[in-house]
Amino acid sequence: MKRFSTAYLLLGILCSAAVFLIGAPSRALGAEVEHYEPLQVHVQLEKVYLDGDVSIEHKHEKVFSMDDFWAAYAGWTLVEQKKGYVLFRKQMDDISPLSKVNGYIGVSDNGVISTFHGRPEPASEPIQSFFQIDLERLESHMQKNLLKGIPFRTKAEFEDVIEHMKTYSG
């Protein structure tokens, strides 16, 4: 009988301790946890495309967890960080959405192969300049095509024209 009463006594002590411990963390944490406001961050995202175009997106985010914030931008490269501001950049393995609609490869006034939004004109500003080309080495129809602009709508078309033009670089 003494054995049962000792067992009941131990069981009672363990149950009391368990009830105390289960309630203890919430009481202890409530007293120690400080309330923090989420961090407000201006995020700038830059996508750099093969054709030289850059798209920029601005976002304002509330950051509750830095681990979650960094995980959300795992595929991006951190370029700049200061209080309340973060700049991320990503190299895209494609041409820009705008170039898929209206991209042209042409030659600038100084004979440099360049990409343009729309047909190259004397006043057109190139998106990206690539390399100098010797126009005299080109066949006359290729010269004309390049001067009026060669359209590209896909990454493959863009790469084909650039690779072909490299053979005429000076």
UniProtKB/Swiss-Prot annotation:
Lineage of the species this protein comes from: Bacteria, Bacillati, Bacillota, Bacilli, Bacillales
Purpose: Inhibits the SpoIVB zymogen from undergoing autocatalytic activation by an unknown mechanism, and in this way plays a role in the sigma-K checkpoint of sporulation.
Stretch forming the signal peptide: 1-30
One family name in Pfam for this protein: BofC_C
InterPro entries documented for this protein: BofC_C (IPR015050), BofC_C_sf (IPR038117), BOFC_N (IPR015071), BOFC_N_sf (IPR038118)
Main localization, broad class: membrane
BP term (GO), one: sporulation resulting in formation of a cellular spore
Name under which the protein is recorded: Protein BofC
Superkingdom to which the source organism belongs: Bacteria
Subcellular localization, as worded in the UniProt entry: Forespore intermembrane space
Subunit structure comment from the entry: Monomer.
Organism name: Bacillus subtilis (strain 168)
Keyword entries, A-Z: Signal, Sporulation
